[in-house]
From Swiss-Prot:
UniProt name for this protein: ATP-dependent lipid A-core flippase
Function statement: Involved in lipopolysaccharide (LPS) biosynthesis. Translocates lipid A-core from the inner to the outer leaflet of the inner membrane. Transmembrane domains (TMD) form a pore in the inner membrane and the ATP-binding domain (NBD) is responsible for energy generation.
Residues binding ATP: G384, M385, S386, G387, G388, G389, K390, T391
ABC transporter domain residues: 352-585
Organism from which the protein derives: Syntrophus aciditrophicus (strain SB)
Domain ABC transmembrane type-1: from-to ranges: 36-318
GO CC terms of this entry: plasma membrane
Subunit organization: Homodimer.
Listed GO MF terms: ABC-type oligopeptide transporter activity; ATP binding; ATP hydrolysis activity; ATPase-coupled lipid transmembrane transporter activity
Gene responsible for this protein: msbA
Location of this chain's protein in the cell: Cell inner membrane
């Protein structure tokens, strides 16, 4: 299955890294007008920076040596004007580039989130929640530095560099050639520093994903952690990953810190040679102090843009490492998509047909040669030992997965030939693990039923036996129920989930062990609500407690991915086959549980 592949980033080399960088720059295309204005500001700021070095010659020769009073007025005024205009350009350039960078990050994060939403369930089984969260947050943020900061430095510092090089060649081409000998020596170390930084950045992002996954697991599973007294163990696991992240961060700082002194050392060699030769020229009388110091000022001013350009390579490498991971998801083609000629599925009126289907996950067979017809309005329960394939079979109907072979039809329409939205609008789901959102009770009930009225929400809550406890909450229907509904009991969460399904009013209903985790009192209230929900609907029940499916129209027994029996409850018991064995096994377990309960009391 295509969707079973993970989103592990490929290893990119040479031209591929350049392609990624170009792809990042293309994200700025919609912002071309702002980028053009920012670029003009950067060019002006770069030119004005180099003009300061140009003014050193007239300042020294005309003011201090020739004592020209007129120049004493104009040069200070020119310097003030240069700094004023340069400051304004730098401000507007920073604001514009920051907007472009943040806008690109927001758009990229939206694209990434939308792409994740398109993936099938197999994608999520391959990619932990924490890793995906890290991609959307940390990896996307690393791209922002490349798009705005690195591009700004490349444009502004490169132009400043060109202007300053022009000044030093204009002032003394012989000294300029001596200075230029040093620059080629920097190319190799810059490349090596960049390679190391990219490697560390990739490892840092992987470790950050692992840390986020660990954090998400332990916080969501905090009850189990405490129940099994594993706090110390989890603290150690977190500390190990955190320590690894700290060492990688220090390594990144070390690489950055080492690159600057190395460049300073090479620059120092060049400046020492220039002072020796330039001083000799002044002593000999073939040059003036103003010319030499103008040259030297331009050369010293070259240091900062060169330093930033060496560091910008590290920023780019960090961004490319993050982009590899982000694009590895954005470029994934979802398994489950609408066909070009997909049609709308009418409301079910006849039957669901499952024709000779098979399904494999990672080449491991899960379902084999399943044939089943479910009439509209029929209640069909699926039972079997854990791993028998009952949940997988039911998940194929809303196309959470696609069949490996065979077909599923609703009223004669192959579900692969209809649009996903029209298919899934026909299906309501209530699961054992109730998923609620950190929002109000009202919005959780109305989830997926946009435009419904307050009256409809309350009617759905009443039908789900939820209205009475809702009105007793602090804010009633406006009460925010916490992450995953943690402020509510299991039975209360389940009844809100049932109210949500009632409000959706879908003709097909999937109940995935909806009462298996509830106590007896809560189960009775939920079961009553479920019976109202099931009325008049085609219902597929994944059952754990066989006592809850006695009244099903038909019970389907799956063993190792195959249907071995089907029929009504009493009929299957009379056959003394697999269903009878399951019933007897559960009856014994229930009896033992009752005995233990009596002894405890």
């Amino acid at each position: 299955m295509a969707g079973n592949r993970g989103c592990k980033p490929r290893r990119f080399e040479g031209n591929q890294r350049m392609d990624i960088f170009k792809r990042l720059l293309k994200l700025a295309r919609p912002h071309a007008p702002r980028f053009a204005v920012a670029m003009v500001c950067m060019l002006i700021a770069g030119a004005l920076t180099s003009s300061l070095a140009f003014l050193v010659k007239p300042a020294l020769d005309d003011i201090f040596l020739d004592r020209n009073a007129e120049m004493l007025k104009w040069i200070p005024l020119a310097i003030i004007l240069i700094y004023l205009v340069k400051g304004g350009c730098s401000y507007f350039q920073a604001i514009l580039m920051s907007f472009i960078g943040q806008r690109i990050v927001a758009d990229l994060r939206n694209r990434l989130y939308e792409q994740i939403q398109k993936q099938s369930l197999s994608f999520f089984s391959k990619n932990p929640t924490g890793v995906l969260m890290s991609r959307i947050t940390n990896d996307v943020n690393s791209i922002q530095g490349t798009v705005s900061d690195a591009v700004t430095s490349l444009m502004k510092d490169s132009f400043t560099l060109i202007c300053l090089v022009f000044v030093i060649f204009y002032r003394d081409w012989q000294l300029a050639i001596i200075a230029m000998i040093v620059f080629p020596l920097t190319i190799y170390p810059i490349a090596k520093f960049g390679q190391k930084m990219r490697s560390v950045a990739t490892r840092t992002q992987v470790t950050m994903g692992s840390l986020t996954t660990l954090l998400q697991e332990t916080i969501s599973g905090t009850r189990i952690v405490r129940a099994f007294c594993m706090e110390a163990h989890e603290n150690q696991r977190f500390a190990r990953e955190n320590e690894k992240l700290m060492h990688l961060a220090l390594k990144s700082v070390s690489i950055n810190a080492l690159s600057s002194p190395f460049m300073e050392f090479l620059g120092g060699i060049g400046i020492a040679a220039i002072i020796f030769y330039g001083g000799y020229q002044v002593i000999k009388g073939s040059s003036t102090p103003g010319t030499f110091f103008s040259f030297l000022t331009a050369l010293i001013m070259l240091y900062e843009p060169v330093k930033r350009l060496t560091n910008v390579n590290n920023t780019i490498q960090q961004g490319i490492a993050g982009a590899q991971r982000v694009f590895s998801i954005i470029d994934l083609v979802p398994d489950i998509v609408d066909r070009d000629e997909a049609v709308e599925l009418p409301r079910i009126s006849e039957k669901i047909e499952i024709r000779n289907i098979s399904f494999a996950y990672d080449d491991t067979p899960v379902l084999r040669n399943i044939n089943l017809t479910i009439r509209a309005g029929e209640v069909v329960a699926f039972v079997g030992m854990s791993g028998g394939g009952k949940t997988t079979l039911v998940n194929l109907i809303p196309r959470f997965y696609d069949v490996t072979a065979g077909q599923i039809l609703i009223d004669g329409h192959d579900i692969r030939d209809v649009s996903l939205i029209s298919l899934r609008r026909q299906i309501g789901i209530v699961t054992q693990q109730t998923i609620l959102f950190n929002d109000t009770v009202r919005n959780n009930i109305a989830y997926g039923s946009q435009g419904c009225s307050e009256k409809e929400i309350i009617e759905a809550a009443r039908a789900a036996n939820a209205h009475d406890f809702i009105v007793n909450l602090p804010e009633g229907y406006d009460t925010v129920i916490g992450e995953l509904g943690t402020k509510l009991s299991g039975g209360e969460r389940q009844r809100i989930s049932i109210a949500r399904a009632l409000l959706k009013n879908a003709p097909i209903l999937i109940l995935d062990e909806a009462t298996s985790s509830l106590d007896t009192e809560a189960e009775m209230e939920v079961q009553e609500a479920l019976e109202r929900l099931m009325k008049g609907r085609t219902t597929l029940v994944i059952a754990h407690r066989l006592s809850t499916i006695r009244n099903a129209d038909r019970i389907v027994v799956l063993v190792k991915g195959e249907i071995v029996e089907e029929g009504a409850h009493e009929t299957l018991l009379a056959r003394r086959g697999e269903y009878y064995k399951l019933h007897q096994l559960q009856f014994k377990e229930d009896k033992v549980g009752e005995e233990v309960g009596r002894n405890d009391s």
